[in-house]
């Protein structure tokens, strides 16, 4: 048997035959099931990761933290202020959406039980869950389900609706004290 014009006569399907498929829908998810390979542009400042090992399956239930390099400084708590460098990658697209390395400046964050200030920013829940207990000097990868990221709304245009996120975070400083406010000069 052979093919003629794309028809497969040996299977009994002619070139002008209608086909009907029966499909069992097993599950529906607003969030992607798999992560795309990461594309990280090279940074201009030392230390920026050029590769991020994306999880094969998108994070669904829990925040997962992988220690890439363990520091030996104080441990972060939910009451801590952390100074960090980071790169964030969309699980759905594999594209970098943010990087403090690219802005040429680390940021200071207030963990969930610390009070945000004009110099220490609040963060998504996945950051607090992923950084709690990590040591100053560590580099960690945090895989975050969409519920602990930007939720069903996302953060357009870079973070889609229900998009799981992957961050690589370098913890430069852990402190129990809020950073000082910038001084103004007149």
Which residues are covered by each model-predicted region?
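Cross-family detector of peptidyl-prolyl cis-trans isomerase
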Residues: 1-186
